Amino acid sequence: TEEGLFRRADKAGEGFDLDVRVGDEIAPHLIARRLADNWRVLCAAPAYLAAKGTPRTLAELAAHDCLVIKERDHPFGVWQLMGPLGEESVRVTGGLSTNHGEVAHQWCLDGRGILLRSWWDVHDSLQDGRLVQVLEAYHQPADIWAVYTSPLASSAKVRVAVDFFRQYFAERYSLPE
């Protein structure tokens, strides 16, 4: 089923060697190795901003069409962000929501709303101008991790995979200053 595609897998019970995940919520019985520093940023298509205006404060997001993604363990429709005053939250709504990040990214490119998405995922769209970062002083920490169980701690294949992913992210994506 489609629901099965987006559930959290039982790595040990289902025979998975490695899980690559975004976010710092990792069960204590698992081993996690950071693959890359990452954060989620707010962005929108220039066409959306031209039609609806650019939010100037976090509170103004509540009046915008936001593209809400059901993330693993995050409250739906509540964006918790780090900003100039520390951690802040805003409740957001919009006509579109999904549990698939690529769908939300495409909606954002199509000018359907404001998106909170991982830097590595929207980096190219920001670089080529298809998306614009909004409220640049805000971000959500979301590092990228390789997660596995302790029986695989000395596995050569896991070590090679972790090294590959670290190099991949280091060569392609660096966070802005």
Could you tell me what each predicted segment is?
Residues 77-91, 125:
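Ligand-binding cleft/hinge of the Venus flytrap
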Residues 11, 61, 106-111, 126:
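Hydrophobic residues within well-ordered alpha-helices
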Residues 1-2, 68, 89-100:
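Short beta-strand-to-loop elements that line the ligand-binding cleft
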